[in-house]
């Protein structure tokens, strides 16, 4: 059973289709979180990456890790509706094997260091227990800008 379902994730993260890359949060502790992304053949990125051999772009695997980490960071912020978690950097990124349509991507982030508004996490992505990608993700907590007025 999931700790957070997709509707609850959408209440925490500002991302929406097609850029929301987390379907569920499976486990969550103070300094560790595990999320899941079902990678389907209908993902929009498979249209061009690559039509003959669809592979999930590595940058989107990293983004999915960062989103899972963002849930962990925002869950600890009292006034999270007024904050955003921005992806700041990735270090030591390694991609071990392709992620294909039909794969279930398990994304784990562990907090390594936290200073006021900056969080450093170890991210690991697995499929069927095999590491497909890993890296050190850095995120920054910032104030959410006020909604802009419609132009017209």
Segments predicted by a language model, with ranges:
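Hydrophobic beta-strand-centered segment that forms part of the acyl-chain substrate-binding groove
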Residues: 1-3, 69-106, 132-134, 139-140
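HotDog/MaoC-like acyl-thioester-processing domains
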Residues: 14, 100-103, 110-152
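Catalytic strand-loop segment that frames the active site of acyl-thioester-processing enzymes
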Residues: 17-56
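Flexible, low-complexity linker/boundary loops enriched in proline and small hydrophobic residues
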Residues: 2-26, 33, 138, 148
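Beta-strand-rich interaction surfaces with strong enrichment in secreted/lumenal proteins
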Residues: 10, 52, 95-97
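Conserved positions in beta-strands of structured domains
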Residues: 23-26, 91, 96, 108-112, ...
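Active-site helix/loop of acyl-thioester processing domains in fatty-acid/polyketide metabolism
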Residues: 25, 56-79
């Amino acid at each position: 059973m999931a700790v957070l379902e997709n509707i609850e994730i959408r209440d925490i993260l500002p991302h929406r289709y097609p850029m929301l890359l987390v379907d569920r949060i499976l486990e969550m502790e103070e300094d560790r979180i595990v999320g899941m992304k079902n990678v389907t053949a209908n993902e929009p990125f498979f249209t061009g990456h690559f039509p003959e051999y669809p592979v999930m772009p590595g940058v989107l695997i990293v983004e999915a890790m960062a989103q899972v980490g963002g849930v962990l960071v925002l869950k600890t912020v009292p006034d999270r509706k007024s904050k955003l978690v921005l992806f700041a950097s990735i270090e030591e990124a390694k991609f071990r094997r392709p992620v294909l349509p039909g794969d279930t991507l398990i994304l784990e982030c562990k907090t390594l260091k936290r200073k006021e508004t900056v969080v450093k996490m170890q991210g690991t992505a697995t499929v069927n227990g095999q590491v497909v990608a890993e890296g050190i993700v850095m995120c920054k907590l910032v104030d959410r800008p006020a909604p802009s007025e419609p132009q017209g």
